[in-house]
């Protein structure tokens, strides 16, 4: 469960290291975002000499949360960190690599490009 002011790790090589959520895209007054939701975030920590810089406002899709994810089959998935992937306006990832495991639920939200470059899909 991600809400405004939550800090997230970045799970790609776009140049950002840490993000802070500032808005959840979707409904006007949604309090929490879950896996597959798009957020507006500000970059709090970045790699030097890359395309993304600190204090830049970006869009990101949430790919891992510490709050457990329940599937229809009864399986529960829980991650060790909150992580997101930086995307552009069309929903394509800005980085060319993805780090860590990515849940299968992103397919139903239309993020198939992220799933295709992910090393492990759960």
Swiss-Prot record:
Q: Which Pfam families match?
A: Ribosomal_L14 (PF00238)
Q: Which HAMAP family match?
A: Ribosomal_uL14
In this UniProt entry, which cysteines form S-S bonds?
none
> Which BP terms from GO are recorded?
translation
Which residue windows are coiled coil? Answer: none
Q: Kindly list the GO CC terms recorded for this protein.
A: chloroplast; cytosolic large ribosomal subunit
The record's subcellular locations are: Plastid, Chloroplast
GO molecular-function term, one example from the UniProt record = large ribosomal subunit rRNA binding
Q: Which UniProt keywords apply?
A: Chloroplast, Plastid, Ribonucleoprotein, Ribosomal protein, RNA-binding, rRNA-binding
Name of the protein this chain belongs to: Large ribosomal subunit protein uL14c
Query: Where is the major localization of this protein?
Result: plastid
Q: How does it assemble?
A: Part of the 50S ribosomal subunit.
Please report the organism this UniProt entry assigns to the protein.
Jasminum nudiflorum
Gene, per the UniProt record:
rpl14
Q: What is the purpose of this protein? A: Binds to 23S rRNA.
The record's family statement is: Belongs to the universal ribosomal protein uL14 family.
């Amino acid at each position: 469960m991600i809400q405004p002011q939550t800090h997230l790790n970045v799970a790609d090589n776009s140049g950002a290291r840490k993000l802070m959520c500032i808005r959840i895209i979707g409904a006007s007054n949604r309090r929490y975002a879950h896996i597959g939701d798009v957020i507006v975030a500000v970059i709090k920590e970045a790699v030097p000499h890359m395309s993304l810089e600190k204090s830049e406002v970006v869009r990101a899709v949430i790919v891992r949360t510490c709050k457990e994810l329940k599937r229809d089959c009864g399986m529960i998935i829980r991650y060790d960190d909150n992580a997101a992937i930086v995307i552009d306006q069309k929903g394509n990832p800005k980085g060319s690599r993805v780090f860590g495991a990515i849940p299968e639920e992103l397919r139903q939200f239309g993020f198939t490009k992220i799933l295709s470059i992910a090393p492990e899909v759960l």
